[in-house]
Amino acid sequence: VFWGMDLFSYLFASFVATAYFCLFQPFMGAWMGERWLLPLSFVLVFCLNEYVGWNHRMLGSYRAVLGHFEQDQWFMVSSAAVNLILSFILFPMFDITGALIATVVAHCIMWAGRVVVVFRRYMAGGLAHYLAVQALHLVTLAVCMGGSYAICARMPGGWLGLVPRVLVVLVVPNVLN
């Protein structure tokens, strides 16, 4: 059951990240105008944040059911501290993108804590497999996002340009995954 739920989390996370990456800027450009677009680097980091959050959602559910909250409490505390410290360091260098990078790093620390609890208590011996699957998922995510973005970049702008982009986002990630 765990591996099926983990796969579902990945499929949903990769779809959400790819959809944001391909649709966010064109939608905002059509709605608010090009002048109000965020930097593409911000959109990419935002997509990674969504991916990290959704990808380990089921792992988090398993971890919550297991209890043993004391085992990963320091990961949570570390996550908050790292987020705060990195935000102060990265914001002056990268503006709002820097603060979001700090959040992605913090979410990865929380993810690591959940991995530790679940694979110590529930899935003993499966950690290497989980890490290999996550590495493969990350490569596949890059291909999905990059491939979909390359196709969408050839689409016309404006409101009508969103229609073929939506079709690309609905098809390409699902075919590649």
Predicted segment positions?
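Specific pore-lining/lateral-gate transmembrane helices of multi-pass inner-membrane transport
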Residues: 1-77
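Short alpha-helical transmembrane segments in multi-pass integral membrane proteins
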Residues: 8-17, 76-79, 97-118, 170-174
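Membrane-embedded alpha-helical segments of multi-pass transporters/permeases
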Residues: 17-25, 30, 42-45, 84, ...
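Alpha-helical transmembrane segments and their helix-entry boundary regions
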Residues: 71-73, 99-100, 130
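Transmembrane alpha-helical segments of multi-pass transport proteins
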Residues: 78-82, 93, 129-177
